[in-house]
């Protein structure tokens, strides 16, 4: 695992310099009974490499109906506190707003992946605003996966109305065969909100796990 992680970080460093960009790696595990074991393995590799600055965060993804062992959350929080890693959790994509609350309270999430269910709970919207948690909105993916039906407006419109922090993201671009630019287009088709789009780059920098952007 350490060797594979080093290869990835070396490539990120090489191409960051080649194209004069800043980039970092978020280590992702999926929900399931082996989630703690997988996270320990990744964190062990991270520590064995001297806690490289190229690793900037941790992510929990996968089926929200699967509850990982309770220790998973404490491992995420511990890594956040000890190493200063950003935490993003896929939650609220399948309609359960309580998963968003759990991601924030139990895992210490700084960002929420998808989070389309947030508009169903005024309480959770208040929590999001109070703690300044950012939603990673993926317009194209949400339609393709059925997280948002073809006949319903995308929840991002209500997020804007309720002052919920969010950024536009791509999700599995190789699988969905779409780019971030196309997600921008989808967002504009949904909202026609030029003000939000004009400020999107600054919003993305604000909530990025990269230091000093």
Name each region found by the language model.
Residues 35-158:
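Catalytic core of soluble alpha/beta enzymes
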Residues 14-21, 50-53, 82-85, 192-196:
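Short helix-capping segments at alpha-helix termini
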Residues 88-94, 164-180:
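Short acidic/histidine-rich active-site segments
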Residues 1-27, 36:
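Active-site loop-helix segments enriched in His/Asp/Glu that coordinate
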Residues 130, 181-183, 190-213:
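Mid-to-C-terminal alpha-helical segments outside catalytic/metal-binding sites
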Residues 149-161, 175-177, 183:
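Flexible glycine/proline-rich, aromatic-decorated loop/lid segments
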Residues 23-25, 87, 135, 166:
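Hydrophobic/aromatic residues located in beta-strands of well-ordered beta-sheets
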Residues 139-145, 167-169, 185-190:
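Short beta-alpha connecting loops at secondary-structure transitions
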